[in-house]
UniProtKB/Swiss-Prot annotation:
Keywords: Cell projection, Coiled coil, Disease variant, Neurogenesis. This is FERM domain-containing protein 7. InterPro entries: Band_41_domain (IPR019749), FA (IPR014847), FARP1/FARP2/FRMD7_FERM_C (IPR041788), FERM/acyl-CoA-bd_prot_sf (IPR014352), FERM_2 (IPR035963), FERM_central (IPR019748), FERM_CS (IPR019747), FERM_domain (IPR000299). Residues 537-558 form a coiled coil. SMART domains: B41, FA, FERM_C. Plays a role in neurite development, may be through the activation of the GTPase RAC1. Plays a role in the control of eye movement and gaze stability. Expressed in liver, kidney, pancreas and at low levels in brain and heart. Expressed in embryonic brain and developing neural retina. Residues 2-282 form the FERM domain. SUPFAM superfamilies: PH domain-like, Second domain of FERM, Ubiquitin-like. It is found in: Cell projection, Neuron projection; Cell projection, Growth cone. It comes from the Eukaryota. One of its GO terms (biological process) is regulation of neuron projection development. Its main location: other.
Amino acid sequence: MLHLKVQFLDDSQKIFVVDQKSSGKALFNLSCSHLNLAEKEYFGLEFCSHSGNNVWLELLKPITKQVKNPKEIVFKFMVKFFPVDPGHLREELTRYLFTLQIKKDLALGRLPCSDNCTALMVSHILQSELGDFHEETDRKHLAQTRYLPNQDCLEGKIMHFHQKHIGRSPAESDILLLDIARKLDMYGIRPHPASDGEGMQIHLAVAHMGVLVLRGNTKINTFNWAKIRKLSFKRKHFLIKLHANILVLCKDTLEFTMASRDACKAFWKTCVEYHAFFRLSEEPKSKPKTLLCSKGSSFRYSGRTQRQLLEYGRKGRLKSLPFERKHYPSQYHERQCRSSPDLLSDVSKQVEDLRLAYGGGYYQNVNGVHASEPVLESRRRNSALEVTFATELEHSKPEADPTLLHQSQSSSSFPFIYMDPVFNTEPNPNPDPRDIFSERSSLSSFQTSCKFSGNHMSIYSGLTSKVRPAKQLTYTDVPYIPCTGQQVGIMPPQVFFYVDKPPQVPRWSPIRAEERTSPHSYVEPTAMKPAERSPRNIRMKSFQQDLQVLQEAIARTSGRSNINVGLEEEDPNLEDAFVCNIQEQTPKRSQSQSDMKTIRFPFGSEFRPLGPCPALSHKADLFTDMFAEQELPAVLMDQSTAERYVASESSDSESEILKPDYYALYGKEIRSPMARIRLSSGSLQLDEEDEDAYFNTPTAEDRTSLKPCNYFLA
């Protein structure tokens, strides 16, 4: 038995026991099973051969024939095939492993790019590993961990970008990181030193589109698969034969010299595998052995091609299995996962007051244990909402125009979706006065999205959907208009209600409809039928008296001796004066602040509640039925309808780098160079020559025509 050590991308190691005669596929399958990896064809096992070259473990060849001392070799689990667009990766685990590979390439200097681009990528890695920005923690972590060769001079930029990623989950950070990396010139490039026919030092590399020729980090030539007729090697010379109609004035065979025969053969095998994975529709078949002994190589690619992977994933056969990310527990637990909501921050104390006043709902955590106060004791420093609130408060000076508030968006995104409550807007012909004083229902919890997997799940993912049906607690900023026979021409002071349903107002009135609509009819309030002396009617009468005193005071200040609220037409100047008077009494403050006690309630794009709280929404149609027989002031009619609080997912940094067409994984159409790559059904053909091995790609006449297909995810 062989005890073989495999090192994974998170630097963890595991020893697998295989049979003495096992092939490389046995060890590779054990490694993928250890990770619960479904899209395994993108990866491979690399090791250092006896000649000092890094080579890939062949899956069809016995391990003992590839490695002299297997027990002393450490096999490295790495990304082997880099797709043109990481949006082709269906599984979150696959994207996470690609992110770890990008992280290693950054540390080794394999991905040269600008300082801003490098700092932005590292900031996404920090967001995935540490959570939201915290200056002290970030500074300490960057001092202990090396992400870049020149990290010291970029720490300021890294922390600046990390501060803009508040609220993003690790999965979202992985997608953004891969979207940046795929646009770099050296993405997925593994250069192999060589020299051309004139003795100039160059590097050869293979990618999804073909064979590349580089000088330093600059591509000086690209030979697409469609141009190549044959790839072969002879001793340490690597040969590229082109189609005759491609370069008429140049030689159809290009020769490059590599360091050794082993290095040349290893690069040739990599080219064979890349061509099969990206160009063939299915795995190439094995050739029957000939009677005569051949000295040529019989190497072929083993595994599913990219086309098969995409078709297999499109049919939904790939199973998403849970996995554990690499985090830094001491820092992560100390900060209580700052991506989770902070229910006790200064901004959200009003929501907590509502919960205490209107009964504790009943929630269920991830372990199935019910709790009435979920995560109410998690005080932290610099929570996600606090940082966002401070940023928005700074941007809101001077005061923002209330008419433009609905166009603003928060720079942070929270993983919550507040659904619209379902209201019954039908008028109730027989309102029951007891409903006004009925028992209030408990607050309904809401469905959260679990962005963190494994044991690093954030605190907020313990809240689940509501356990029992309950009525939504609705915030209604409705002016309390007395139910009298007179029309109110002046905007009364707004009285806010927190009730389980819209406030029900008795509909009795002795005035006939034609009398109310007549402009010359007037009925004294004393002529109305007296109501029952209930506490509610007493309060209504008191409010009417206070309102009349206030109206008379305003009339005296405006130069009018009498106010007829029922007969004469509404004076818009007087109404404006009244509204301005009330607004002047309100302290000046920014409209972006999330204060539920202001005269005009902030819109949903600025107020983002962070915990189990009632769905706060404007419902102009809720009280149109209650006051259907009265003319509401015009200022009420501009109230917006029910709003949906949906966390945005936007990035404010390096917008020229991030493009929206990447998210093919979530249903958006992808426009990428892959659409221009023509898939070929050609197979490999190996000729038998002494010390010579190569493969032929079919010519333009022999190439099997394949119907153009779009293998991008819908």
